[in-house]
Structure formats: C-alpha cells, structure tokens
Amino acid sequence: MDDNEDELEEHQELVSDGSVEEEEEVEPDLGPVDSWESFNDRIDGLIFNERCDKSVKKLDERRLAILNRVRQQFREAPKGVAERCQAQKSPIDQRLELSSERLNELVRFGKELVTNVRVANERRELNRRLFEGAQKNQMHVKLQRESVETMARFENIKARWTELEETNEPMLLWDQIEEQKKRIAEIMARKDEMISACQAEVDRMNAKYEFDRERQAQDLCCLVERVDHQVETLKEAYKEHIQMLRQTIEEERQIFADNAVEKWRTFFDAMNANFDEKANLVRAREQFYARQTQQINESQEELTKSTRIRLEKECERLELELRRTRDNVLMNSEKLDYNYQVLQKRNEENVIINNQQKRRVARLHEAIGRTRRGLKNLYNTGKRNIARLSSDIYKLHSNINDMESKAHQARLNNREKFDRIWEINYKELNLLVDRVYHIDRIIHEQQLAMPWSSPVPPIPNINKAKKKRNNILEKFDMRIGRVPKNRVMPNSGVNCKPDIKELPPDSLRLMRNLIRKLSDRGGFLIEERLLKILEPYSEEEKCLVRIDNIFAALRIRHLRDVKELTKVFMPYTYCPNCQPQGLSPRKCAEVFMKDQKPNRLQGAAGGQPDEKEHRSTGDTFLPKSEVAAKRCHNHYLVMEPALCLHAMNLFTSKMHKKMYEHEPGSILNAVNLIQITDAEIRNFWRQFSACFPASKCKLWKTLEHGLNHYVEVLKMRVQYDAEVVFLRRQNEELRHLLQKFTV
C-alpha cells in the first residue's frame, strides 16, 4: 500500500509539472495560412514537436517504469496459492490458457490495426476543421475591412457631389466628374477582386473535398485489407492451437494409461505380500481387545463411586443458589418501580415535543403556500416563454422554405457530380478494356503466333441528356395552397360555372346529410372544454362552422366539384327504407381493404401514384350506387359515420391529384433529376462484362493454370529439400547417440 501511495503521489506531481510546462510553453498564434498543404505541414510540426509532447512522453515513461517494477516484484515474490494451483494444473488446462492468451493477443492486435485507421481519419478531420475555421475567419475579417474601406470611399464620393453642385466653371466641373468616375471605378475593381477571391476559395474547397473523398476511399481499402489479413491470421492460429490441443490431449491420455497400469501392478503385488501380515494382525488385535475390556470394567466401577460423591456436593451448591435467587428477585422489584417513575417523566417530555412538532408543521404549511405562489409565477413565465417559442417556430417555418431551395440546389449539384463520376468511370472502363485488348493482342501475336481482331465494337455513352432545372417557385406555391401556373385542371368543366342552388333536391338532401355526418365524426377534433361551453346553447347557436367555410376549405367553388363530391360519397350510402339493417360489416371491410391496397402499392413503389387502381375502385362502386339510386328512387339516402371521414379523405386526395397534375409533355417535379433508370444503368455497365468473350477467358485460364502448376511444382521442390535437410540432421543425431551407447 505504501508503494502504491508513493507511486500515485509521484504521478500527480508529474501531471502538475506537465500542466505547468504546458502553461509556460504556450505556442504563438497561427499566422495566415497560404494553402492546405502548408497548414498540414504546420499541424504535423506541432504534433511531432518535442515541447508539445514533453509532458505526454514523461507520463508514458513513468507509466512504463511503474509497470515494469510491479512485474519484477511479482516475479521475485514467493509463489502463493494461485501460483501453486497454476503449477498443479493439468497440461490440457495449461494449453487452453496459453492458447486463449495468444489468441486474445491476436484479436487485440487486429483491433488496434482497425482502430489506427479510425484514429487517422479523426485526426485528418480535426486538421481540416482547424484549417477551414482559420480560412473562414480570415475571409470574414477581409470582407469586413473591405466593406469599411468601401463605405469610407463611398462617403467621400458622396461628399464631393455636394461640392460639385456649388461649382460653376465647366472645365473644373468636367475634371472633378472624371475624378469621381475614377473613384467609382476603383471601388468596382476592388469589389471584383473580392468576388474573384471568394470564387477561388470556393474552388479550393471543392478540390479539397474531392481529395478528401479519394483519401477516404484509400483508407477504406486499407481497412478492408487489414481486416481480411487479420481474419486469415486468426483462422490459421485457431487451427494451429486446435492441433496442439489435440496433441496435448493424446499425450495426457497416454500418461494416464501408463499410470493406471503401473498402479494396478503395484496394488496386486502389495495385496499378495500383505495377506499373511493381515492374518497375524487380526490375532494380535483380538488379544489386545480382551485386555482392554478387563481394564474398562475396573475403571467403570471407580467412576461410579466418584460420580455419587460429586452429585451430593452439587445438590448442596444448588440450595445455596436458590437462596441467592430469592434475594435478587426482591432487588429487581424495587428497580421496576423506579423505572416506572422514569417512564412517566419521559411521557411528559414527549407531550412537549409533540406540541413543538405541531408548530413546525404549521410553519411548513406556510412554506407550502409560498411555494404555490412561486409555482403560479412560474406558470405565468411559462406562458410567456411559450408565446416566445411560438414566434420562433414561425421563424423556423420560414427557414424551412430556404432549406428547400437549398435542397433543390443540392440536387442539381448531385446531378453534376453524377455526370462527372459517370464520365470518370466510363473513361476508366474504356482504358481498362483497351489494356485487356492490348494484352490479348500481345498473347496472340507473340505467344500464339495468331492474328488478332477486336471481339466487340466500342460501347457508346448513354448519359448525354441535357440537365433541366426545376422552378423553385412552384414548391412555394404548393406550400401556401396556390395552384402553380404549369398545373391545369381538366378541360371538361372550365367554362361552366353554375350555382350550387341549381342542384336537384335529392343531391341537396344528400349533401346536408353528408355534412351532418362529417360534423358528427369530427367531434374528436374539438376539445372537451369547448363542448362544455356550447352546452347551454341551442342546436342552431352551436353551429360554429358554416357550409360556405367547409366548401372553401375543400376548394369547392363550382357545381362540377359538388357533383364530384356526390359521386365519391355515393358508393358509401344506402337507403334506410330498403336496407334497415344498414351496410354489412363485410362491405365496410371491403371498402377499407380496396382503398388501402393502392396506398400500400404506392409505398412499395417509392410514392408513385397508381391511377389505374383508384380508377378501378371507383368504377366498381359506381355501378352499385347507380343501381341502388334507380331502385330507391326519391328515397332518403343515408351514410355510415364510420365511412364518412374515409370518403372525405378519398375526395381530397382525388382533388389534390387533379389540381397539381402536370401539363401534358412536361417533366414531373421529381426529386430525382437523373433521367436514366436503374435497369438502363445496369444494362449499360453489364455491356462491359461482355467485352471479353468466353473463349478468351478460357485461353487466359489455361495459361494461368499452367503457371500455377509450375509454381506448385517449385513449392513441392522446396518442401522436399527442407525434408531432406531435416532427415539428414536426424541421421546425424541418431549416429551420435549410437556412438555414445557403443562407448
């Protein structure tokens, strides 16, 4: 314990010394950085600087010294119970422990290899952030200085214009106007220089991004190679340790067999040798028991006499203790009386303490009142904070629109990057195919002495479509609920604008019933507090939303919209006179299932609308509704409340689809700007795999097989040479042993 405390004190002193040295050796501020390479050189210089790593090196050296000293103490210390148990372990257990230790070291080494790559990436990212921060600060300072100087020049020019108004001489006025033009030209030139500097910074950042991406790809390749190599190493190590464990088990089994044979042989020899001795011992034991029995009888008689005398003395002693017990009982009764009086006094003290506790409880109630008042104040402040946060939310909504425009620009940038990567891969594959053809031509002309011809003509590039930019204002119009200019409604009902009052009475009656069902089913949208407030009013006064507002919310402005709404709701209606039991649960389930299937298919296909399925569901229900309407002429149609919101959802989705569909021939406003499908891309890149026919592959495989066979022959030759050397060494050792035995 004393050694450990001394080591901890020395470690703390070393850490404190390191911190003092770090405070004393403060590095000067970084100056302006010219490029990313110079910044990396400076960072590496700081990292490998001896002054920066002085405290860290001291800590490492101190830690290693302490670790070596503790290990030396463990080696020199006498063996304890654990070491003796370790020495007594079987060879199998020792082999298992040794194998587990070595395999754990291999696994730990593999983890370190993988961790080194991650640490290098994190270090590179740290350097990049430091450099980008420095560059950003420099550019910001430069822009601020330029704006200050520009404003000063502008104020100077503005002041000179007032002086020009007072000048009456034409030549002097002309000279001063020319000077003003020169000053303005200088300001514009400085602005152009700043713009070019900013553009150069943007180009540098793009180049740095490409460089970092290539370096990251190299790190990933290195990491994959390390992992594969470590996996193969672990496989070989596990196989070797399993083989060694099998050999150890076989040796242990042979040792156990030899020990068992030797044990049984010695046992039978000892049993045959000691048989006569056991008979003699039995006769001697019988004589000894006879003598012992006689001695026990004599000693028992003497013990009985002594016990009688001892019991008489014990009886006299118990009588004396009985007298003493009576005296103690009298003393205890007097003590009980005294304790009773003491308890009465304590009871009086407890009454006083209870009164004090009651007063304390009263003070606590007062504290609770103060706490409640504080809670009320907190509630009011919370309301104010909620209002402030609501305003922040509105600001965030405006920021969302900006982010959408930025996202659109990012998609355009991704399209450009896709084109660049496509062009790079296309060029690399063409170069690779040319190299393969060149090698194949050399093989045919030089090795096989055969004429060579190109098997496949060159593959044309399919990614040559022009990029078209989408209009960002369309998304803003859709967000605020305005129909964009390039969205058109169907041409069927553009010119007709009849009034809703021209509807037949049946349609008006059905619409009134539908709106009532909607209001009944929308009760969950209203708070219970509002229902309690409206409870004392009449049914007409409870109406908070009028039909005009509902139609305005649903974008129903013409008679065709009302007819469309009626068509959507007709499949879910029934006649209460002809069908008093209402719609069957089976039909309701069919409605939900048929409407949910298109939605699931849309989600699986990536959100693309399926017009045919919506059309099919509408067509299946419309004939039934028309038949029911003809059969139940002038009947009062009703609707299930459970299907009301479902039908309204179908109507809104249908209207939204009509309002926001594109013009014929226009490109969809999709997120993906790449006009080539995945199948076309796969087919295009698969064409390169067919550039080299199967006959050429067989020829190359045949050559490879011959070379591999030659390599295997060389390996076998090396193995045979090693075996010959080993056998010669064994023969020399055996010859040496035979010479010793002959001597």
Curated annotation (Swiss-Prot):
It comes from the Eukaryota. Residues 175-332, 395-416, 715-742 form a coiled coil. GO terms for biological process: axonemal dynein complex assembly; cilium-dependent cell motility; regulation of cilium movement. Residues 1-10, 19-28 have a biased composition (Acidic residues). One of its GO terms (cellular component) is axonemal dynein complex. The keyword Cytoplasm does not apply. Pfam families: NYD-SP28, NYD-SP28_assoc. Keywords: Coiled coil. Residues 1-34, 599-620 are annotated as: Disordered. Disulfide bonds: none annotated. InterPro entries: DRC1/2_N, DRC1/DRC2, DRC1_C. Belongs to the DRC1 family. This is Dynein regulatory complex protein 1 homolog. The lineage of its organism: Eukaryota, Metazoa, Ecdysozoa, Arthropoda, Hexapoda.
